[in-house]
Curated annotation (Swiss-Prot):
Catalyzes the cyclization of 2-methylgeranyl diphosphate (2-MeGPP) to 2-methylisoborneol (2-MIB), which likely involves the intermediacy of 2-methyllinalyl diphosphate. Residues 48-58, 102-111 have a biased composition (Pro residues). Residues 17-27, 59-75 have a biased composition (Low complexity). This is 2-methylisoborneol synthase. InterPro entries: Isoprenoid_synthase_dom_sf, MIB_synthase, Terpene_cyclase-like_2. Keywords: Lyase, Magnesium, Metal-binding. Residues 1-116 are annotated as: Disordered. It catalyses: (E)-2-methylgeranyl diphosphate + H2O = 2-methylisoborneol + diphosphate. One of its GO terms (biological process) is terpene metabolic process. The keyword Chloroplast does not apply. Mg(2+) binds at D197, D198, E202, N345, S349, E353. Its cofactor is Mg(2+). One of its GO terms (molecular function) is terpene synthase activity. It comes from Streptomyces ambofaciens (strain ATCC 23877 / 3486 / DSM 40053 / JCM 4204 / NBRC 12836 / NRRL B-2516).
Length: 440
């Protein structure tokens, strides 16, 4: 595990020296060079169709043989695209070669596909089973960090932490991470974000009352407070006062060592969006208000997974330049990806939230209330909403790939799409946390 060095804020004019255990982060941005794959090839490479077995044609059927796609040709075209950009200046943007610890005699064998049932009718793409060696190592490191570095949870919460399966989650979402150290950047942030959600908002003592003050002070653990000499010491002391702030502070310290200043600022901005969404949901909870469906979806554009896929370049060891990230068409892609993945969470956590005390807002609940539908019909309509958002995300990504076929853009889009798919796979397979309603 990398040495985090002294935790806490950094001077605004001084960026920490990158940790020696994450040597792959580029020192400079290679020039962008247009590449040849078309947008349609790009999308096909992201999500190759899953073959559905059909009856074998009668032997000797020439017409059937002629209608069958040439698997060799299709496979070679797919591999050509997935290899990434080629040509001058694109070497650093190819999907990274992994640098994992050498296999030991007791290393796990290739994993069998995990159990779990997808929501019927949900449009999604399967992902390869995450590398078990990586999953095991990330799981080991994150537990050591949680227990030894940030004292994240009391002993009786250990089962919940293990059931979160965050190692499998992050390995599935970041298939191009060059090292386990890079994967740990995302894993610490994910765990810290969930600690804030659980402890401030939901499961472990959270409450909408006073949430704004708690979130603002926690946000200073990732976006440092700049003040006078008199008031800085009590602020620094506050950063160790509870588990969420300790986790935010430590995870962000690791992140800024590997990220560029613009990547770190992007993450801070996306976390401010997330906290704004938390506050809207809390305000509705305090007044027992059920928003209109469109209002709920607007809230979920902020209270969603956006901060997770948008660090795909940092975790991949490269950078999407700030001007390309800020393009309106890129912002639309990112927003649609976040919106679709968040409805996945609503669908898989539906029964869990119904069994929890109080009323939890999720898309099926809001649709049922506002559109006067049965629970089943509201849930099925929420599936349709997700599917429309997912298709819109993929169409927007294809349009952007065609309009701006630069290596960094294409790789970033692939990374976001991989995160969307990995996020669904984690929800589908995490039967410790999620189960489906009996609507089919």
């Amino acid at each position: 595990m990398p040495d985090s060095g002294p935790l806490g804020p950094h001077s605004p004019d001084h960026r920490p020296t990158p940790a020696t255990t994450v040597p792959d982060a580029p020192a400079s941005k290679p020039p962008d060079v247009a590449v040849t794959p078309t947008a349609s090839e790009f999308l096909a490479a992201l999500h190759p169709p899953v073959p559905i077995p059909s009856p074998s044609p009668p032997s000797g059927s020439a017409s059937a043989a002629a209608d069958t796609p040439d698997a060799t040709t299709v496979g070679s075209a797919l591999q050509r695209i997935l290899r990434g950009p080629t040509g001058p200046g694109t070497a650093a943007l190819a999907l990274s070669v992994r640098h994992d610890p050498p296999s030991l005699p007791g290393s796990p064998a290739p994993a069998e596909p995990a159990a779990g049932r997808a929501v019927p009718g949900l449009y999604h793409h399967p992902v390869p089973e995450p590398d078990p060696a990586r999953v095991e190592e990330v799981s080991r490191r994150i537990k050591r960090w949680a227990e030894d570095e940030v004292q994240l949870y009391p002993e009786d919460w250990e089962g919940e932490f293990d059931g979160f399966s965050v190692g499998r989650y992050m390995v599935a979402c970041h298939p191009d991470a060059p090292t386990v150290d890079h994967l740990m950047l995302a894993t610490r942030l994910m765990v810290a974000e969930n600690a804030v959600d659980d402890c401030y908002c939901e499961d472990h003592g959270g409450s909408p009352v006073g949430l704004g003050g708690r979130l603002l002070l926690a946000h200073t653990a990732i976006d440092p407070f700049h003040t006078t000499a008199e008031y800085a010491p009590p602020w620094r002391e506050s950063l160790t006062s509870d588990a969420p702030r300790r986790a935010y502070r430590s995870a962000m310290d690791y992140f800024v060592r590997a990220a560029t200043p613009s990547q770190a600022d992007r993450y801070r901005h996306d976390m401010a969006r997330l906290h704004l969404g938390y506050l809207a949901e809390a305000a509705w909870a305090q007044t027992d208000h059920v928003p209109e469906v469109w209002e709920y979806l607007a809230m979920r554009q902020f209270n969603n997974f956006r901060p997770c896929p948008t660090i795909t370049d940092t975790v991949g060891g490269y950078e999407l330049p700030a001007d390309l990230h800020a393009r309106p068409d890129m912002q639309r892609v990112i927003a649609l990806a976040g919106n679709a993945t968040t409805i996945v969470n609503d669908l898989y956590s539906y029964t869990k939230e119904l069994d929890s005390p109080g009323r939890h807002l999720n898309l099926p609940v809001v649709i049922a209330e506002r559109e006067r539908l049965s629970e089943r019909d509201a849930y099925l309509k929420a599936v349709e909403v997700h599917n429309e958002l997912q298709h819109a995300f993929e169409a927007a990504a294809a349009e952007l790939a065609k309009a701006c076929p630069l290596p960094t853009v294409l790789r970033f889009l692939k990374g976001v799409a991989a995160w969307v798919d990995g996020n669904h796979d984690w929800h589908r397979t995490n039967t410790y946390r999620y189960s489906l309603p009996d609507f089919w």
